[in-house]
Amino acid sequence: MEHAATTGPRPGPPSRRVENVVLRAKDWLPGAPGGTAVWATSLEAEVPPDLALNKEQQLQISKELVDIQITTHHLHEQHEAEIFQLKSEILRLESRVLELELRGDGTSQGCAVPVESDPRHPRAAAQELRHKAQVPGHSDDHRFQVQPKNTMNPENEQHRLGSGLQGEVKWALEHQEARQQALVTRVATLGRQLQGAREEARAAGQRLATQAVVLCSCQGQLRQAEAENARLQLQLKKLKDEYVLRLQHCAWQAVEHADGAGQAPATTALRTFLEATLEDIRAAHRSREQQLARAARSYHKRLVDLSRRHEELLVAYRAPGNPQAIFDIASLDLEPLPVPLVTDFSHREDQHGGPGALLSSPKKRPGGASQGGTSEPQGLDAASWAQIHQKLRDFSRSTQSWNGSGHSCWSGPRWLKSNFLSYRSTWTSTWAGTSTKS
């Protein structure tokens, strides 16, 4: 601490105020013999020599004490100034209240005399006393003449004040009743409007509930229809697969039987015809599966659109105010989309000009030779044709029995079935002709 005091800037000489404070402190405290204060002698006696304060520290402490006293003095002055301001404000308000009371009394009396002329006013009373003091020879007759007037004024003033107050109270009551009646009318109007709004909201909620029930039922029916459609598609696919397998089996048996007969050209023609027929059937099946897939996608898209519309309706009816959207059951297009039954066979029919052109038009092979399935393949013996005819007859009977049980194995166009039956009848007639010739 001493090091800091020696190295720091040396303070200047103490001001006169500090010296006065120090002198006053010395005057207040009793001194010891020799001119030193008691607290100084006791401090010197108690504090060791190495802890004794130097003059700079003493001056610093004295300066801080003086600053504290100055701050306290400023605060005291500020407090007194605020008290004076508050008192002056109170006096001003009291004078204003008194002036307003006097003005109200003067207005109720209906006289336009100044406030100082009022005998109740302190200034008027003081002037009257001063006038009486200046005129000591004031006659008693004049005093008696003035006294009845002064004695009658308070009664008239009280009567006028009472009548004025009654009029004001009556006007205030009438005004209050008129305002209350207007408020009652306004409240009744608002109540009717609120009741109408509640009824409209209730009706809208009922309509929304009814439409939601209808929408849910339609969605349920749509889901049931989709489930039934999926089930029927699976069943149809299974039947088609079974039909294709049986047809392939019969065709390969016919080809093997023809190969066993040893007629090479006729066997090649029959094989080509059967392979072309199977390929057309496979193409028809693929086209039908693609159509069913497109129909399923369209149904799914419609379901998503319907769900979105349902959500929009719910949001529109839940929002405050009038609904922006109107739910119309007639606008729902819940009828199934028409699935086209056009297959590759119909396209070929349009291109070649007729149902029989598919079988009658020859196919160009890569080798350049035209090999086509003719309507009357020649060159087979009677035994081969008899076996082929028997196989086809068995297949036809099994197909008829399957159709009779409520199923339909033929999913292609009708003209292909008629051509197949006509081709079978042609084989039968050819076999009958060859058998008679033999």
UniProtKB/Swiss-Prot annotation:
Cellular component aspect of the GO annotation: centriole; cytoplasm; deuterosome; perinuclear region of cytoplasm; sarcolemma; sarcoplasmic reticulum
Coiled-coil region: 74-105, 217-246
Cell compartment(s), UniProt: Cytoplasm, Cytoskeleton, Microtubule organizing center, Centrosome, Centriole; Cytoplasm, Perinuclear region; Cell membrane, Sarcolemma; Sarcoplasmic reticulum
Tissue specificity comment: Expressed primarily in skeletal muscle.
Span list, region Disordered: 345-381
Membrane as UniProt keyword: yes
Stated role: Component of the deuterosome, a structure that promotes de novo centriole amplification in multiciliated cells that can generate more than 100 centrioles. Deuterosome-mediated centriole amplification occurs in terminally differentiated multiciliated cells (G1/0) and not in S phase. Essential for centriole amplification and is required for CEP152 localization to the deuterosome.
Protein name per Swiss-Prot or TrEMBL: Coiled-coil domain-containing protein 78
Organism, as annotated: Homo sapiens (Human)
Lineage of source species: Eukaryota, Metazoa, Chordata, Craniata, Vertebrata
The encoding gene: CCDC78
